[in-house]
């Protein structure tokens, strides 16, 4: 979504779903995995909305929907691409919205060639470039422009932050867009390229690729079209069922294209609702737990890039849009971290930041571990021995470390692999031969510490400590703060320049209690930041690049406005409207719907009274409405920037997407993605089917490691499709739930879902045992024979699907095989996410012979 709209966060909030006229849920079992938010889907259904669930499995979400369509795991782009084609073929797009608010009229340069011409490749493909083959993205550019932020002419491995939870499409050179055709007839304008690209995604091809019927597909496409436009809006909801593919980012891109064509972005009851994988996954990415970003989705400096802060700013800034203020964002971050030590003379300590070269993702780190190139590892809030694809390879990697620190609530599999794991049981690993020194440090749960969750709708909510942690349990904040103090104490007499980044850090947070717990509120206040007088910032607009302001995360500026913890606000719903602006705080600037300038027409009037949300008040000369306007408050709809305008001032008054360089929603992405400017259907890395569109079967840019510990399935030996999923009763890798008696009683055993026809074909008995195999591993599971997971008919044959929850491991009150043992380490190239929603397997009756 970042490359499509300008920010990677959900465009809307869950309460707004109640005002949708149609809700399409794909890649999510929302009723079971996000049950609190699902109440608003049920509210919409009671108001007459159509609720459609498209998924390989029939779940509780399907049961409460008005329509369920079963599809093959891994065929999402084929289905969504069919909707794009349906919109274009039947002329159902929102014409004024598309022409005025998107890059549909923009003309693309002559070098661009489509996958329809190059049989599954975009122009610029070089199979010998880089580790996996790379695209020369300059061939995708707007006519007369060049990429602004790309570090070189190729698509760099580390640029995927543009497509993540908060990334953006990057800058464009001055003068954009250089050429437009508002009639949308130019053969190289984005609109015509889009039509040609998706022309083959007919209902018949969708049915062939996905395993549904043409009639089922048309019913979904028509429902979205009929419930979009001036008077009506539709929403699309997804979760990790879309992200965990080698084309995960491009699946989400296809949904963004649909919503832009239908005019649903920035409007009440519309948008794209990204349901995150746990309570604060949005917050963890906002604050940069990913290797390639800094807080607020600023890019990490590159090791091969020279020129210091000036060159970094030059590559990060966009001539138009709010990323034109990237210099203020990065300098304010540096001031928050290094305070008085950060001066203009020393580039505000920019050189203190680590520089990255290529890939430092979790999977590449473990590949290096397997080669004994990693000496130590700290695992916090992570259980790679169960939760990562090809968990066996991860356990083998851990066994080659010199030391390992695991911080968790209980002793999870990543802490016990050296004496209790499938490899210990089989003899592949021997405890006495493992050199790793393992430290297990008990952590505090969220009820034992103050802090925040930033949830699926960018809502930062404060949680208060309810009880003191027991024994040696400590919060992660306590751990890192006191670890920092000890390191600084060790280095206090150092004169080595490499130690200055640690010694110069602002590390003076107030502490409290017998264990000297640092104040979480003080950290939140630092994220918010201060102005030149030391006053708390009210938002990010006052940030400056001269060193007079500080902010630990520019997106969070305003969360501590007026020196008050805004995330702790709890005004009851009956005392405010449904937007609930005084319940907690949402980034940025407490906006609940992003791009809400698009809820008004180009002249600033609501598209309809029924969908009135934000509009231009001609008398007051400002934008107003039910939410914080996502636009410059005093910029009129007819504002036309002068030629020398920069940053936000370069965005027209009728261009709502203020984080994009041109202020437009991007149907076509000229830069920011590694695998193509448009989504296209590729088969999963492992698939029993041939690509119905191209001879190129899988995403050519997918990230592969070609390791002996990660062999690929042969097509003939593994005839079935596996998809993994979550249960309501267990949480992620199971460390927090398999140790809880009543949750373990509710879901007491690892199981596999199979259709009755597959059970007969393989001799599987309901309640009996089955062994599921891939080339990586084999696990055993109890058999659940059910009609809920349908076989797929494609290419004239039937292929069965097997459903596996992934919560089990060797520890806890309930133990079982880990579904991730079966998976391969093949990743989406943009965000390095594993493909565990679609792979192949074999299944046989009986227990796994060890």
Spans of features found by a protein language model:
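Conserved short loop/turn motifs at secondary-structure junctions
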Residues: 205-212, 238-246, 275-279, 382-386, ...
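Short, polar loop motifs at secondary-structure junctions
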Residues: 54-60, 409-412
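Long, contiguous, secondary-structure-rich segments that constitute the structural scaffold
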Residues: 478-533, 624-627, 632-634, 639-650, ...
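Extended redox/cofactor-interaction regions of prokaryotic respiratory oxidoreductases
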Residues: 1-36, 40, 47-49, 153, ...
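Short beta-alpha connecting loops at secondary-structure transitions
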Residues: 63-71, 417, 425-426, 442, ...
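Glycine/threonine-rich phosphate-binding loop and adjacent beta-strand/alpha-helix elements that clamp
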Residues: 436-469, 480, 668, 785, ...
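Long, well-ordered, tryptophan-enriched scaffold segments
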Residues: 62-228, 318, 486
């Amino acid at each position: 979504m970042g490359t499509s709209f300008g920010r990677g966060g959900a465009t809307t909030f869950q309460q707004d779903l109640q005002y949708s006229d149609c809700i399409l849920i794909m890649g999510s079992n929302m009723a079971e995995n996000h049950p609190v938010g699902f109440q608003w889907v049920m509210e919409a259904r009671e108001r007459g909305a159509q609720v459609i669930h498209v998924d390989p499995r029939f779940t509780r979400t399907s049961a409460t929907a008005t329509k369920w369509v079963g599809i093959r795991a891994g065929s999402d782009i084929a289905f969504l691409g069919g909707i794009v084609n349906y919109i274009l073929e039947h002329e159902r797009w929102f014409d004024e919205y598309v022409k005025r608010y998107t890059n549909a009229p923009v003309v693309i340069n002559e070098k661009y060639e489509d996958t329809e011409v190059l049989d599954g490749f975009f122009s610029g493909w070089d199979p010998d470039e880089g580790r996996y083959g790379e695209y020369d993205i300059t061939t995708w550019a707007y006519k007369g422009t060049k990429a602004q932020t790309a570090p070189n002419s190729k698509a760099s491995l580390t640029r995927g932050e543009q497509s993540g939870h908060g990334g953006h499409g990057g800058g464009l050179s001055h003068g954009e867009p250089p050429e437009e055709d508002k009639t949308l007839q130019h053969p190289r304008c984005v609109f015509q390229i889009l039509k040609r690209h998706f022309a083959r995604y007919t209902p018949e091809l969708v049915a062939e690729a996905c395993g549904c019927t043409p009639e089922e597909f048309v019913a979904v496409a028509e429902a979205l079209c009929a419930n979009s436009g001036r008077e009506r809006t539709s929403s699309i909801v997804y979760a990790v069922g879309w992200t965990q593919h080698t084309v995960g980012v491009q699946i989400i891109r296809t949904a963004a294209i649909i919503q832009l064509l239908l005019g649903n972005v920035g409007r009440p009851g519309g948008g794209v609702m990204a349901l995150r994988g746990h309570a604060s996954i949005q917050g963890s990415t906002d604050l940069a737990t990913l290797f390639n970003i800094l807080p607020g989705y600023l890019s990490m400096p590159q090791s091969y890039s020279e020129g210091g802060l000036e060159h970094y700013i030059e590559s990060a800034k966009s001539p138009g849009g709010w990323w034109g203020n990237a210099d203020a964002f990065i300098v304010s971050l540096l001031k928050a971290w290094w305070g008085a030590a950060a001066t203009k003379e020393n580039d505000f300590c920019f050189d203190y930041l680590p520089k990255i070269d290529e890939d430092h993702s979790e999977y590449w780190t473990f590949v290096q571990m397997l080669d004994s190139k990693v000496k130590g590892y700290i695992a916090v809030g992570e259980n790679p021995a169960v939760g990562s694809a090809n968990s066996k390879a991860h356990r083998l990697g851990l066994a080659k470390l010199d030391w390992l620190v695991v911080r968790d609530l209980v002793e999870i599999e990543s802490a016990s692999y050296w004496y209790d794991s499938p490899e210990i049981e089989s003899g592949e690993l021997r405890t006495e031969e493992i050199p790793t020194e393992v430290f297990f440090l008990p952590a505090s749960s969220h009820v034992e510490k103050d802090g925040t969750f930033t949830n699926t709708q960018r809502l930062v909510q404060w949680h208060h400590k309810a009880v003191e942690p027991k024994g040696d349990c400590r919060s992660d904040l306590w751990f890192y703060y006191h670890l920092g103090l000890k390191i600084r104490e060790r280095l206090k007499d150092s004169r080595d320049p490499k130690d200055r980044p640690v010694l110069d850090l602002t590390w003076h947070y107030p502490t409290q209690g017998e264990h000297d717990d640092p104040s979480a509120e003080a950290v939140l206040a630092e994220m918010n930041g201060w102005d030149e007088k030391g006053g708390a910032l009210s938002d990010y607009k006052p940030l400056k690049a001269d060193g007079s302001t500080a902010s630990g995360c520019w997106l969070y500026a305003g969360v501590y406005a007026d020196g008050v913890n805004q995330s702790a606000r709890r005004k009851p719903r009956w005392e405010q409207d449904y937007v609930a602006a005084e319940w907690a705080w949402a980034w940025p600037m407490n906006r609940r719907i992003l791009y809400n300038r698009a809820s008004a027409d180009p002249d600033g009037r609501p598209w309809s009274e029924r969908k009135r949300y934000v509009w231009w008040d001609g008398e007051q000369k400002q934008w107003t409405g039910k939410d914080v306007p996502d636009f410059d408050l005093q910029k009129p709809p007819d504002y036309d920037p002068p030629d020398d305008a920069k940053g936000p001032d370069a965005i027209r008054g009728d261009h709502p997407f203020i984080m994009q360089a041109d202020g437009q929603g991007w149907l076509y992405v000229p830069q920011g993605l590694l695998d193509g400017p448009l989504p296209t259907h590729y088969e999963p890395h492992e698939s029993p089917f041939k690509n119905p569109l191209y001879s190129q079967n899988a995403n050519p840019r997918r990230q592969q490691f070609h390791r002996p510990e990660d062999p690929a399935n042969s097509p003939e030996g593994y005839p079935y499709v596996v998809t993994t999923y979550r249960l309501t009763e267990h949480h992620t890798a199971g460390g927090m739930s398999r140790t809880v008696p009543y949750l373990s009683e509710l879901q007491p055993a690892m199981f596999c879902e199979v259709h009755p026809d597959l059970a007969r074909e393989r001799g599987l008995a309901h309640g009996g045992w089955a062994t599921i195999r891939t080339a990586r591993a084999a696990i055993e599971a109890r058999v659940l024979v059910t009609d809920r997971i349908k076989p797929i008919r494609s290419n004239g044959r039937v292929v069965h699907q097997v459903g596996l929850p992934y919560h089990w491991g060797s520890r806890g009150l309930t133990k079982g095989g880990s579904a991730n043992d079966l998976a391969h380490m093949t990743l989406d190239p943009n965000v390095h996410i594993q493909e565990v929603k679609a792979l192949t397997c074999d299944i046989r009756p009986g227990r796994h012979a060890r």
